[in-house]
């Protein structure tokens, strides 16, 4: 990953690569694909100073808090469907600015600022996605910069 590239363009380029070379769920062991009933499960697959890769397992009904990220991110869905809602921050409230239903092979990328979203598995099967972050998850611990608890208008 060369330095100096525009973060948003880089995230979209990585998403293109993920879309073209989507791995199967077999990159996780069968027991890792189960998830957990009380929370989504992340499996960090690779981490270094330039980027990190993790797989996220979502059981039906699980969702994230509304959040943004430390750096750019790209993802591809390996199993199920992940519903994403995008938001804009107005300081004292958020507004919804978009929605997407991402199925198997769908990939996307985004970068701060303007990367506020929530992801939800509203389906009946466990969803699995692969994420690439421009963050060292080994050092940072997580990719989330901020969780939002603002009213929606």
Placement of each model-derived feature along the sequence:
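Glycine- and acidic-residue-biased ligand/ion/polar-headgroup-sensing regions
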Residues: 71-89
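Domain-scale activation on soluble regions of proteins
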Residues: 99, 121, 132, 139-153
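A short hydrophobic beta-strand segment most commonly corresponding to one strand
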Residues: 74-76, 124-140
